[in-house]
């Protein structure tokens, strides 16, 4: 099993690489790529960790050696948010980066499962899809926007509020991966109940958690360590499913049946070919239904921007 981390010298990439070096199954290959010259050094550093995972790092303009033979590609390349920026501001730089990488993936490892971490995910995933379509290699079962960070934040915040073990809390999060498009389904959390005020406050905190970290880092970066953890969780789920483990369920932003929007974050069952089944989002509360209805125009607009970018 080969996993490639693209953008591996960045804050997310290094955290993700560290976690994967420790947690990938024995015998896995981990390839790191970044345009930054430090990348082979990051791999050298991680290679000293005594786990049965081989690691190589590649730098420069061409990601081909890292992508060759990859089963899973996790893309975190791009610029990070700074105070005052929203995820849309990132679009101007990151859209071109994702487009160029998708063009490489289409040629070098078209059958790989690709997880897009680079923001704005609502838009970068449709960009990758359009590029892969143009190349004639698009398989909607194998392209994912990694929204796991919204899920782990929700689990953490709910556990703290209700004094639960965060490892035992499960919170479905649907929609997209920025602002109002992030919708935690708090009515479906088992074993706890919330007042209307708690629901409103928690939902807002989950939607704005990225900004919370950007501001706390005071210009020194965005959410890199928690995102590395989230991407690792999703990457390991993909690896398990590809290796034949059954009943692997995660949340991700994928091309669905178009019931809500062309791409939508929802629970998915993973299998040997990526998405095995789209799972139902379940029954929503009146608050959640109103929030879902209210965000769809924003989400569809984000998707359309990505489609237009590739045309």
From Swiss-Prot:
Substrate binds at residues 81, 87, 119, 153. Its EC number is 1.1.1.37. It catalyses: (S)-malate + NAD(+) = oxaloacetate + NADH + H(+). GO terms for biological process: malate metabolic process; tricarboxylic acid cycle. Changing residue 277 to E: In strain: M550, M551, M554, M557, M558 and GD98200. CDD domains: MDH_glyoxysomal_mitochondrial. Keywords: NAD, Oxidoreductase, Tricarboxylic acid cycle. NAD(+) binds at residues 7-13, 34, 94, 117-119, 227. It comes from the Bacteria. Changing residue 171 to L: In strain: M553, M535, CO391, CO407 and 653/36. GO terms for molecular function: L-malate dehydrogenase (NAD+) activity. InterPro entries: L-lactate/malate_DH (IPR001557), Lactate/malate_DH_C (IPR022383), Lactate/malate_DH_N (IPR001236), Lactate_DH/Glyco_Ohase_4_C (IPR015955), Malate_DH_AS (IPR001252), Malate_DH_type1 (IPR010097), Malate_DH_type1_bac (IPR023958), NAD(P)-bd_dom_sf (IPR036291). Homodimer. Belongs to the LDH/MDH superfamily. MDH type 1 family. Catalyzes the reversible oxidation of malate to oxaloacetate. This is Malate dehydrogenase.
């Amino acid at each position: 099993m080969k996993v490639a981390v693209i953008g591996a010298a960045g804050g997310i990439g290094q955290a993700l690489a560290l976690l994967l070096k420790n947690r990938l199954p024995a015998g896995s290959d981990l390839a790191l790529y970044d345009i930054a010259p430090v990348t082979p050094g990051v791999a050298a550093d991680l290679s000293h960790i005594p786990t049965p995972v081989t690691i190589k790092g590649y730098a420069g303009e061409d990601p081909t050696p890292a992508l060759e033979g990859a089963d899973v590609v996790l893309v975190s390349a791009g610029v990070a948010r700074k105070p005052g920026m929203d995820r849309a501001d990132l679009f101007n730089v990151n859209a071109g980066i994702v487009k160029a990488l998708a063009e490489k993936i289409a040629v070098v490892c078209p059958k790989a499962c690709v997880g897009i971490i680079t923001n704005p995910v609502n838009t970068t995933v449709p960009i990758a899809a359009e590029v892969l379509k143009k190349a004639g290699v698009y398989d909607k079962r194998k392209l994912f926007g990694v929204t796991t960070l919204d899920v782990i934040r929700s689990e953490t915040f709910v556990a703290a509020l209700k004094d639960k073990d965060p490892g035992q809390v499960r919170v479905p999060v649907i929609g997209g991966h920025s602002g109002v498009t992030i919708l935690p389904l708090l009515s479906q959390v088992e074993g706890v109940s919330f007042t209307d005020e708690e629901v409103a406050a928690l939902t807002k905190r989950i939607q704005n958690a990225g900004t919370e970290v950007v501001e706390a880092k005071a210009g020194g970066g965005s959410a890199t360590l928690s995102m590395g953890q989230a991407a690792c969780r999703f990457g390991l789920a993909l690896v398990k499913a590809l290796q034949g483990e059954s009943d692997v369920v995660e949340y991700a932003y994928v091309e669905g049946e178009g019931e809500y929007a062309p791409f939508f974050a929802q629970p998915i069952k993973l299998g040997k070919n990526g998405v095995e089944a789209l799972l139902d989002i379940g029954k929503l509360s009146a608050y959640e239904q109103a929030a879902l209805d209210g965000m769809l125009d924003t989400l569809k607009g984000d998707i359309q921007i990505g489609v237009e970018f590739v045309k």
